[in-house]
């Protein structure tokens, strides 16, 4: 309960969160009014939400540059009316994703870590710059990281179908994973594990 209040307080008092708020507003406008996320109307709506007014400079413009299918992640959040509450929930989800990715990375590496060291590692995972900043800004990075780490663990354990699905889902943010994905898929093809490629391609096609 105390942790929940802290997250809610942080989401309300902190001026960040532009990445999440833009996509949340884009998703709401798209679902409720059929407004394209790439339109001027969507950009102005997000700007009013974030700045309280439309953008005064090009640097402030809230123009969507992500693939349309990436909005699927934000659809459940469109049910939340209050942007502060929506952002608080999203921050909690991202925090769980960071912790889960950290734990799975321990299994992936085969690191035999003592409980105290693990706790320190998990604390560091959340509160170092590259863990804490995406949580505060609301970036999708932690979720994509969790998908990639899970996919690599599935590859390690020879669950190729699951690995392919997870890699396909990681394309929610293509700029983050494209190089790694191409490398892994070529590795799979040349090592007789083509199902990784097929399931990744199929999942991406469904998106």
Question: Which stretches of residues belong to each language-model region?
Answer:
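Membrane-interface helix-boundary motifs at transmembrane edges
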Residues: 106-116, 158, 187-196
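Short acidic/glycine- and proline-prone juxtamembrane loop motifs at membrane-interface regions
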Residues: 133-141
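Short aromatic/hydrophobic helix-turn
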Residues: 119-132, 169, 186
């Amino acid at each position: 309960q105390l942790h929940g209040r802290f997250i809610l307080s942080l989401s309300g008092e902190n001026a960040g969160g532009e990445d999440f708020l833009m996509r949340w507003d884009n998703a709401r406008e798209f679902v409720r009014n059929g407004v394209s996320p790439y339109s001027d109307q969507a950009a102005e709506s997000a700007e009013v939400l974030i700045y309280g007014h439309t953008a005064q400079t090009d640097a402030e413009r809230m123009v969507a540059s992500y693939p349309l299918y990436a909005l699927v992640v934000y659809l459940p959040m469109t049910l939340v009316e209050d942007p502060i509450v929506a952002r608080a929930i999203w921050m909690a989800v991202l925090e769980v994703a960071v912790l889960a990715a950290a734990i799975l990375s321990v299994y992936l590496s085969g690191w035999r870590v003592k409980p105290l060291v693990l706790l320190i590692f998990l604390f560091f995972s959340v509160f170092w710059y590259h863990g804490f900043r995406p949580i505060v800004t609301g970036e999708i990075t932690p979720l994509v990281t969790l998908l990639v780490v899970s996919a690599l663990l599935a590859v390690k354990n020879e669950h190729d179908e699951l690995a392919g699905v997870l890699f396909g889902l990681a394309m929610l943010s293509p700029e983050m994973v494209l190089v790694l994905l191409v490398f892994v898929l070529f590795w799979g093809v040349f090592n007789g594990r083509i199902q990784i490629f097929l399931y990744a391609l199929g999942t991406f096609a469904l998106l």
